[in-house]
Amino acid sequence: MSRYGRVRLQAHPAHGLILESEEPAILTELSRGKVGKLLGSRIDDNTIAVAPSERGRLKQELLKAGWPAEDLAGYIDGESHPIALNEDGWHLRDYQEYATDAFWSGGSGVVVLPCGAGKTIVGAAAMAKAQSTTLILVTNTVAGRQWRDELLRRTTLSPNDIGEYSGEKKEIKPITIATYQVVTRKTKGEYRALELFDSRDWGLIIYDEVHLLPAPVFRMTSDLQSRRRLGLTATLVREDG
């Protein structure tokens, strides 16, 4: 897209986050439209302050306005937690290592691999790079326990490091595996599991079978733009269109 990169999001030591462009007229145009509601004060001809909490919404609105932003604001590391791959009798395959490196270089994205190609291993490798607390969102409890078993087999994590947040348990640990169903459950019109996203300073969020990601979960986590986020799937075709 020829307009991509003509507006950029950058971290700023004083303002937290800024939207910048080498073309002041673009910023003026955006300030007067719907995007303007998400913008702060004009710092100079080429720069507008932005509230960090609006990072996700602003990127969506810029895309709708025809000005897709290049996001150079980076990611926070989150709460540190040691983890390494335990390559005892096995090793990352070349394509798994390539997928992990490609994700890490961008900091956020989707890895598409066919069934049986080891998407969970790619997730574990990303966790080993992050060295931080990780929230893993899965389709159901069975998938969550498969993730737990695979992480215990493939990494240096212990059972005490991994928590299950499901209909049966509400454990929040350095590595927490939660089901989409429990995250989207409402009580008195409110998503009770919102506390899960704020319960720790997550450094990495992994979405298993991201093509099944419920819209409410997407909306909840779209505000977590400063966190590294990895989607894993065998297809990019969503079942709900």
Where are these regions (language model features)?
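Conserved pre-motif I regulatory segment
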Residues: D77-V112
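Conserved helix-turn-beta segment of the N-terminal RecA-like "Helicase ATP-binding" lobe
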Residues: T141-K169
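Conserved RecA-like ASCE P-loop NTPase motor core of nucleic-acid helicases/translocases
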Residues: T133-N140
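Walker A/P-loop
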Residues: S105-A130
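Conserved nucleotide-binding/hydrolysis micro-motifs of P-loop NTPases
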Residues: E54-G56, T141-A143, K170, Q181-T184, ...
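Extended alpha-helical interface modules used as scaffolds for assembling large macromolecular complexes
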Residues: M1-G78
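Post-DEXD/H (motif II) to motif III coupling segment of the RecA-like Helicase ATP-binding lobe
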Residues: G203-L204, E209-G241
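Conserved helix/coil segment N-terminal to the catalytic DExD/H
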Residues: S166-L204, A215-M220
